[in-house]
Regions:
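Conserved glycine-rich
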Residues: 187-188
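Histidine phosphotransfer helical core of two-component systems
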Residues: 1-36, 56
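A conserved beta-strand-to-alpha-helix junction within the catalytic ATP-binding
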Residues: 25, 55-69, 130-133
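Short conserved segment of the HATPase_c
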Residues: 151-162
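Detector for a conserved hydrophobic position within an alpha-helical segment of the HATPase_c
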Residues: 182-183
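Conserved catalytic submotifs in the C-terminal HATPase_c
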Residues: 80-92
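ATP-lid-like helix-loop hinge signature
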Residues: 112-137
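Short alpha-helical Gxxx[C/S/T] motif in the catalytic ATP-binding
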Residues: 174, 178
Length: 207
C-alpha cells in the first residue's frame, strides 16, 4: 500500500494545479498516517498472539526500570520521571528480561502520553511520573504513579480487553500485553485513579 501511495505522489504531484496541491498532499498525509496505524496494529497483534512463555532468570529489577526511564526521557525530557526504591538494596528476582523491558516501556510511555494529553488542556500541570518499589511479605510491589488524565473510572477488566483504547491513535493492545506478561509471571496488576492522575500497581512474587 505504501509503495502505491508513493507512486501516486511521484506521478501526479506535478500534474495537479497549484490550487489543488495542498489538498492532494494533505490527503496523502492522512492516508500515510492510517497505513502506519494499521502497521502498528498488525505488529502488536502479532506480538500479542505469539508471545512465548517467559524465560525466567535472576535479573535486576531496578536496572530494567532505570533503563526504560532513560528511553522514555528521550521522547519528552520535560516530564520528570524518577525511581523511588523503598528497600535498602536493589531487587533481584526471576523474570523474563525482554518481556519486562516491554512491560515497563509500555507502562511508562502510557503515563507519559496521559500527561501530554492533559497538558494540551492545561500547560501548568505538574508533569511527574514516580515509580515506587516496595516489599510486602513475599511480594514485590511496583507502583507507577503519574499526574495524567487518569483512567476515567474504567474497570481493570475493561482496560486490559484487547482493542479497548481511549487514545485517538491507540491500538488497544498495549495494556493487554502488559497484563499477559504480569499474569505469565504469576503476578497481578491494578489500574487505579490516584489523586490528580493514575496509579498502576504491580504485585510480583519475591523469588
Amino acid at each position: 500500500i505504501q509503495l502505491t501511495i508513493d507512486r501516486i505522489k511521484d506521478k501526479y504531484t506535478n500534474k495537479i494545479s497549484s490550487e489543488d496541491q495542498a489538498n492532494f498532499k494533505e490527503n496523502l498525509k492522512i492516508i500515510n498516517n492510517q497505513i502506519k496505524q494499521i502497521e502498528n496494529l498488525v505488529n502488536e497483534f502479532s506480538d500479542f498472539a505469539r508471545m512465548p512463555k517467559p524465560l525466567l532468570k535472576k535479573n535486576n529489577l531496578n536496572k530494567v526500570i532505570n533503563e526504560n526511564i532513560n528511553l522514555i526521557n528521550k521522547i519528552d525530557s520535560n516530564i520528570k520521571i524518577k525511581l523511588i526504591n523503598h528497600l535498602s538494596k536493589d531487587v533481584n528476582i526471576n523474570f523474563d528480561l525482554e518481556q519486562f523491558n516491554r512491560l515497563f516501556f509500555n507502562l511508562i510511555k502510557n503515563s507519559l502520553e496521559s500527561i501530554q494529553e492533559k497538558a494540551e488542556k492545561d500547560s501548568k500541570i505538574h508533569k511527574n511520573i514516580d515509580i515506587e518499589i516496595r516489599q510486602r511479605r513475599d511480594y514485590i510491589i511496583v507502583n507507577v504513579i503519574d499526574s495524567g488524565i487518569g483512567f476515567k473510572n474504567k474497570k481493570t477488566k475493561e482496560l486490559i480487553k484487547p482493542y479497548f483504547t481511549t487514545k485517538e491513535k491507540g491500538t488497544g493492545l498495549g495494556l493487554s500485553i502488559v497484563d499477559k506478561i504480569i499474569s505469565d509471571h504469576n503476578g497481578s496488576i491494578q489500574f487505579l485513579n490516584h489523586k490528580n492522575g493514575a496509579k498502576v500497581q504491580i504485585i510480583l512474587p519475591n523469588k
